[in-house]
Amino acid sequence: MSTPAHELCRLGLREAGAGVAAKAISSSELVEASLARIQATDGKLGAFLAVSADRARAAARAADARAARGERRSELDGVPVAVKDLFVTKGVPTTAGSRILEGWLPPYDATVVERLEAAGAVIVGKLNMDEFAMGSSNENSAYKPCHNPWDLSRTPGGSSGGSAASVAAGQVHASLGTDTGGSIREPAAFCGVVGVKPTYGRVSRYGVVAFASSLDQVGPLAREVGDAALVLRTIAGHDPRDMTSSTRPVDDYLAPLEDGARGLRVGVPREWLSGGLDAGVEAAVRAALDTYRRLGATLVDVSLPHSKYGIGAYYLIAPAEASSNLARYDGVRFGLRAADAKGLKEMYAESRERGLGAEPKRRIMLGTYALSSGYYDAYYLRAQKVRTLIRRDFDEAFRGCDVIAGPVTPSVAFKLGERTGDPLRMYLADIFTITCNLAALPGLSVPCGLEAASGLPVGLQLVGRPFDEATLFRAARALERELGPLPAPPEP
């Protein structure tokens, strides 16, 4: 008897892959279930910007043919996934959530897309996002907002909102996002899934539309810790096409996954729990920390004294890099062009005026100002010095602990439209996640329960030493195993 489509959509990634390998289910069945789920739910969710049904069906048939021959490329072989629309995909529209790239068909695939497809994963489409990854609510998408599966009136988080919502709603078994200041971890927390921002350089950025090149990093989102670990193991590793990618060997993240929390030293930054948190979020985070203590971990008080300056430093460094990266969108080589402009300068100005949204324009202005003559030392250079101090704080903290734990966000998912008129309040949603990017460290969000008042998910953030994602997965899995999975969100 075949498995009902809705049950196929809720399978874990590894479980689905094992079913294909055992010929208990086919990749084609999984893909058809995924496509049907997208068609049935995405009118309300808005998680997808493009669905590649024909390409996905062809990949599924190829996976089924391999299974029939007893071949298996990896544990992902034949499983439907999706990627944020920031990754270039050959022949498939890539917009970065912006009108200025509407209709652009890239001539090549991003490295992470190549690696997923080489592993046999079936990419069913491209996911909604804040324009050029600039935002914390997915409301900056030039095409449509994305909605949180737990409550359609709320944000899924940003900028990888579609990546989190699609996984939480069972549209796909895993997804890829990017994280520049919390853009994987915040949506993961808001949508009740696992989201991983790896160490800077662990995953190639080749073929990723750049926002802030010293901060951007690619990572997975999944419903289970082990599934996220498997996807990261698949996409990680050196890429000669990305000069910032590390040559350090990739660990087997699944090997220590079930080692438990006993013996781990969990650092708890006093600055992260000293105010500014909603009561329900703080209660869930403290309960998760108590769970670690019961499981045999030691809680260690640590200090990150310069973390309070992280928002200020980030919103000087990231816009400065964005003002340079986004200069290429001028109507000359690709993207929107103001064909009615009279002269070259007017074409530049009109193409950017019509093609870029309010948030990219705001950040370009911030960055250009920070880099301008007479202000560079006062703003940008000082922000880089603060970045160094933040990195040193983490170095000192890790002298006495193995992982650092705390909240991902100050609140659960907020209402759509609630903060769009107040950019500063929106920026503060990333107050606990930004320092991880500034210090180039790996970070992870794992569900730690539901807020009592709202019934919405709360995420626990775990931060590790450089390239020690394996310990993060071990710690996250220990909590996941003890607390059990969250219930599925309501049907849209």
Curated annotation (Swiss-Prot):
**Catalytic activity of the protein:** L-glutamyl-tRNA(Gln) + L-glutamine + ATP + H2O = L-glutaminyl-tRNA(Gln) + L-glutamate + ADP + phosphate + H(+)
Set out the biological process GO terms recorded for this chain's protein.
translation
For this UniProt entry, the molecular function terms from Gene Ontology, in alphabetical order, are: ATP binding; glutaminyl-tRNA synthase (glutamine-hydrolyzing) activity
* SUPFAM superfamilies registered for this protein in UniProt: Amidase signature (AS) enzymes (SSF75304)
Q: Which PROSITE patterns match?
A: AMIDASES
Q: Which domain of life is it from?
A: Bacteria
Q: Which residues form the active site?
A: 84 (charge relay system), 159 (charge relay system), 183 (acyl-ester intermediate)
In short, the EC number is 6.3.5.7
A Gene Ontology cellular component where this protein is annotated is:
glutamyl-tRNA(Gln) amidotransferase complex
- Which key words are in the record? ATP-binding, Ligase, Nucleotide-binding, Protein biosynthesis
One matching Pfam family: Amidase
* Membership in a protein family: Belongs to the amidase family. GatA subfamily.
Q: What does this protein do?
A: Allows the formation of correctly charged Gln-tRNA(Gln) through the transamidation of misacylated Glu-tRNA(Gln) in organisms which lack glutaminyl-tRNA synthetase. The reaction takes place in the presence of glutamine and ATP through an activated gamma-phospho-Glu-tRNA(Gln).
Q: Which PANTHER family match?
A: GLUTAMYL-TRNA(GLN) AMIDOTRANSFERASE SUBUNIT A, TRANSAMIDASE
- Quaternary structure (record): Heterotrimer of A, B and C subunits.
Q: What is this protein called?
A: Glutamyl-tRNA(Gln) amidotransferase subunit A
Organism of derivation: Anaeromyxobacter dehalogenans (strain 2CP-1 / ATCC BAA-258)
| Recorded name of the encoding gene | gatA
